[in-house]
Amino acid sequence: MAGTADLPLEMRRNGLNPTEELAQVRDRDGVIPVGELYGAPAFLVCRYEDVRRIFADSNRFSNAHTPMFAIPSGGDVIEDELAAMRAGNLIGLDPPDHTRLRHILAAEFSVHRLSRLQPRIAEIVDSALDGLEQAGQPADLMDRYALPVSLLVLCELLGVPYADRDELRDRTARLLDLSASAEQRAVAQREDRRYMATLVTRAQEQPGDDLLGILARKIGDNLSTDELISIISLIMLGGHETTASMIGLSVLALLHHPEQAAMMIEDPNCVNSGIEELLRWLSVAHSQPPRMAVTEVQIAGVTIPAGSFVIPSLLAANRDSNLTDRPDDLDITRGVAGHLAFGHGVHFCLGHSLARMTLRTAVPAVLRRFPDLALSPSHDVRLRSASIVLGLEELQLTW
C-alpha cells in the first residue's frame, strides 16, 4: 500500500488504520497546532467528544468563513464567479442560509422518500455483479462494480444521464485530488458548473420526477439557479467517491476478516450493524472541512484564538476508546451508535440514508455472489491517499 508521509497528519494512514502519530495526538494531546490555514492558525482536533462538540456548535465554529474556493495563483477567477460557486454550497454555509436550503432538500432525502429507490438499487447491484462475473478474473472491483454502482444510483436519484459516466467519474476524481494545482481545480470546477448548468436548464424546460426536476420547479421560490447548480454538484461530488470507496474498502476489510465476512453473508441481522461498524472503522472521509472559531474557545485545555481554524479528524475520533471499547478492532456485531462518519449537527450528511441503502445492498451482495472471493495474488492493493476521500486505485479480485 502507498505511503502517506507527505500528507497532512489527518490524512495519513497505516494501511486502513490511523498512524501511530495520529493516535498519539488523540490519546496524549487531543488538540495540536498544525501551522497555518488560509493565513490563520490551524489546530487539529482528534478526540471524539471534542470533534462532536465542534460539529454541534455552529454558533462558535463557522463553516461560512472557510474560503472553500480559493482563487488560483493565476488570478483568473473573478469575484462574480466565486460568488456563483459559493451559492448553495451547503458545507460552506451557516444558519440561516444553510437552514433555508436544508429545509428545501430534507423531504427529498427522507428514508420514506428514498425507499422507492431500493428495488432499483437492487437491480443496479445485480446487473453490475453480472458484468463483473462476465468480465472474467481477475477483475477490478472498483472499476467494474463499486464506482458504477455508486454513480448509477446517484444518476437515478438526480436524473443525470448515465451516458456521461466517464466524464463524471474523471471530473469527480480531479475535484477531490489534493495533489492537483489550484489552476487544475479551478478548471475542473468550471467544467463541473457548465455541465450542471446544462442539466438544470434542461430540467427547467422539461422537469421530470427525479430530484433535479423536483428542485428545478422550486427555482424562484426561495431557491436560485446558482444555488441549485451547486447543490446538484455537491450531491454528486459528495456521494459518488465516498460510497464507491466504502464499497471497495469494506470488501477489502472483510477479506482480511473472513469470519466476519461469513457472518454478513449468513446472518441478515449483521448487515445493518456491519455497515455501521465499517463506516466507523474505515472513516473514508479523513476529516470534515475546517471550521473557523468565531470567538476564543478552549478545547482539551488548548486555547483556540478567534479567527483560527479547527480541523476535525473523523478517523481519530471514530477510533477513540471513549466512543467504543477496542476501537481499532473491526467487529461487525456491535454497530456502534453515534459514530461521526456522516458528521453531526446541522451539517450531518444529507445523503446518509441513500449511502446506507446502497452499502447495505452492495457489500453483502458481492460476498454472496462470490463465496470464494479473494485478493488477486498478482496485484498489489494500492490506496488512493492524496484525496479528500480515502479510496483504492484498484482492487483486483479472483473468485
Curated annotation (Swiss-Prot):
Claim: Metal-binding is one of the keywords in the record: yes
Superkingdom to which the source organism belongs: Bacteria
UniProt-listed InterPro entries: Cyt_P450, Cyt_P450_B, Cyt_P450_CS, Cyt_P450_sf
Record-linked Gene3D superfamilies: Cytochrome P450
Chief place of localization: cytoplasm
One of the record's GO molecular function terms: heme binding
Cofactor: heme
Localization terms from the record: Cytoplasm
UniProt-annotated binding residues for heme: C349
Similarity comment: family membership: Belongs to the cytochrome P450 family.
Full protein name: Cytochrome P450 FAS1
